[in-house]
Amino acid sequence: MANLKDIRDRIVSVKNTRKITEAMRLVAAAKVRRAQDQVLRSRPFADRLARVLENIQSRMQFEAADSPLLNKREVKTITLLAVTGDRGLCGGYNANIIKRTEKRYAELKGQGYSPDLVLIGKKAIGYFENRSSLYKIRATFKELEQVPTSEDAASITSEVLAEFLSESTDRVEVIFTKFVSLVSCNPTIQTLLPLDPQGIADSEDEIFRLTTKDSQLIIEKDAAPSNEEPKLPSDIVFEQSPDQLLNALLPLYLQNQLLRALQESAASELASRMTAMNNASDNAKELAKNLTIDYNKARQAAITQEILEVVGGASA
């Protein structure tokens, strides 16, 4: 049986590790709420932009619109935007996106297309740059804000927009993690370009808040209020022509779509990290319990052995 001191040192080490993982869980839980607040704050602009586009759509056919962002040309080159995080300790969050990107890349190559990658996040960059002989990398972005901002989305949008307008690529797809709940985050593929604006339909958000129960911090789930604004009047008059409006609004729409993908990915990363740290804390608690049992058994065996030696010596 292991030495008593070794077991005692392991117990101390496991308990210290549990303190760290528990602290990381609470930090991630608080940041999840911040990420959700960011999504909700950007929602009014997204909703109003969608309504304006819907209003314009009702007055004209997009097929007849003179906007390069809507033109569906023959597809030869497809750019994949892979959104991962800069850090680990978040379960399978980064690995799932990388696997989905590899699968999609192989699918497109097998169908005769010429795919390339735009990588967002250090984890994706590190993985695919180490395999640069297998994957064509167009651009990389790292060290974005933990809660993505419109500036982050704008820098990425300008890159992919320039490539699309110059016909260096014919289609742009973003691979990100859709935030479903704290325990469910799904890798998702969405086409960014060419645009097909049919409104922004969002399912009802879930709000998560820290609270206490039985002297323990827990997380409660609630539904976000849906503050629907009335639709724009159908008789509203625009000074500019529909084509001018589209050319001005569609880049904003594209940036908003990408920002939403970045925000959902950030929330998913934090939720995955919170879940991973919660599991690590539970495992550490169970391991400390088992080690304590082993320590007590070893101590009891040592005491029994000493008693036997004393009794044996007295008998002699």
Swiss-Prot record:
The organism encoding this protein is Prochlorococcus marinus (strain NATL2A)
- Record key words, sorted: ATP synthesis, CF(1), Hydrogen ion transport, Ion transport, Membrane, Thylakoid, Transport
Can you tell which superkingdom this protein's organism belongs to?
A: Bacteria
- Family membership: Belongs to the ATPase gamma chain family.
User: Would you tell me the Gene Ontology cellular component terms?
Assistant: plasma membrane-derived thylakoid membrane; proton-transporting ATP synthase complex
- Annotated protein name in UniProt: ATP synthase gamma chain
Supply the CDD domains for this chain.
Answer: F1-ATPase_gamma
- One Gene Ontology term of the molecular function aspect: proton-transporting ATP synthase activity, rotational mechanism
Q: Which NCBIfam families match?
A: ATPsyn_F1gamma, PRK05621.1-2
Chief location of this protein? membrane
Gene for this protein?
atpG
